[in-house]
Every structure is written in structure tokens, then in C-alpha cells.
Amino acid sequence: MNQKVVFLDVDGTIVNDKGIIPESTKIAIRKAVENGHKLVVCSGRSLFQLPQMLLNLGFSGMVTAAGAQVIADGKEIYHAVIDEEHRKFSVDYMEKNNFVYCFQTDAGVVMNKRSEQQILNIMSDMGITEEHLRQLVGEFFIQEDVWNNEKEEKLIYYDAPFGVARVHADLEPYFDVVALSLSGADDYCGEVGINGIHKATGMKRYLEYVGIPREDSIAIGDGPNDLQMMDYAGIGIAMGNAKEEVKKRADMVTSHIDEEGLYRALDRLGLLN
């Protein structure tokens, strides 16, 4: 078997909705690595939001912030950030329409005081505790001039007055907007990134760097922001807990994350033999 590169989403694929990595998932990742395959985190999370328990599993690389940063063999090979003009533009839009929002940087999450309290309330309503939220998003930086950070990679919003399609139409062509990939999120929560930068472009940059063809890549995910990743890969796999639209686009559907979903997928592909 050729060496494979397996790109793994984090939330709902590696880490369950309780913030736990199932033991079967840990075993699967370690076995695949021992068998000579490259496993790469491919997440909407920024690098600082990846817990140490995940980093300890032996990943060969990271595609973070939905493609805005790519790390291979321990070094950064790509990093895109939102320019000042569009940081200001997006903040003006969010404030004018009373969105609850924050920016992700490579060091923490930036938000104003108004959004901080409302995000805590929204997460509580979704069944996510403040402790789990801080595991998900990392450190909070509170500042009123939210746009004033040159390391801002993407924007997350909640409780919007209209759906993702409308927000996308309002913010293009510079930005691309997809539904937020988080258990309990609805069409009024989204991820805003630079148009043309997404998980699949991060995969492409990683594969070109390591010299492995696209047909030897596998992508596994569960949310709308995983669709481009799964379409780009040689094989796209949906978790059993994935949204229905994701399952329909997948080449294969495995079981739920808490029912050995990742282990069964990699085993079925022969990566654990």
C-alpha cells in the first residue's frame, strides 16, 4: 500500500461533544502512524486551540483556522491573515447588525465585552459549559477595537439576525461564509474566512510540500466546513454523527465518533493492518 495522508477534522471527528478523545480514536491514530502513514489535523480551530492531548498523538502536520495556517514537519509553511481594510469592514457589518462575534488569531480569541457575555450565554443554552468553551476556543482577549490585531485569521459569529446564505452574500467577494461546525449550532451561526482559503487549499499546500499525490489522501469529517476537504481528498469519509448533507457527499460513512467511528474507518481502508 502507498503511504497515505489522512486529514482529520477535530470537533465531532477526533474530539466528541464532551471534549473527550475516545480511546479507540487514540489507538487508531497511533496505529496508522506506526504503519507509516501521515496523519494531519485539518480543523477550523486555530493552532493554539488544539489541546495537548491531541498534539501528543503523533500528527505529521496541521491545517488550522480552516486552511489559513499550514504546518508540516514542525514548521509553518503557510499563514494567511485578514487585511486591515476587511477586518474593519467585517466589524462594521457585525456591529451594525448586532451580531455576537469574535476573531480567531494564532494566539487567542479576540472579542469585545458585549460579545463575551453573550457568547457565554449562547454556549450555556447549547449545553456547553464555560470550561468546555475555553477548551474549544482557548484564551479570550477582550478589546473594544476588535479589528485591531494583524494576526486575525477568521471570524466566528453567533445569534445572527439572518442565515448563512445572506451573510455570505453580504460579505463576498473577499470573505467566504459557512455554517459553524459545532454541535447545537444552527443556520444563524457561522465561520467567516478569506475567500479562496479553506481546508482543501490547506490540504493541497501540505500534499505539495510532502510530495504525496492527491489520490493518496483521505479526509474524514462531520460538518459543513468539511465538505470541500472531503471533495478534494482521494477518499472522503463522513462520521456517523455527521450532518445529512455531509453523509450524502461522502464516499463512505463510518459509525458515530463514540462508536469507534474513526477506528472503523481507518481499519476498513487497511491502514491499521
Predicted regions and their residues:
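Conserved acidic, metal-coordinating active-site core of Asp-based
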Residues: 104, 108-220, 224
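Short hydrophobic/aromatic-enriched beta-strand-loop microsegments
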Residues: 59-67, 123, 177-180, 236-241, ...
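Asp-based phosphoryl-transfer active-site loop
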Residues: 3-19
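Hydrophobic packing residues within well-ordered alpha-helices of enzyme cores
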Residues: 25, 50-54, 167, 171, ...
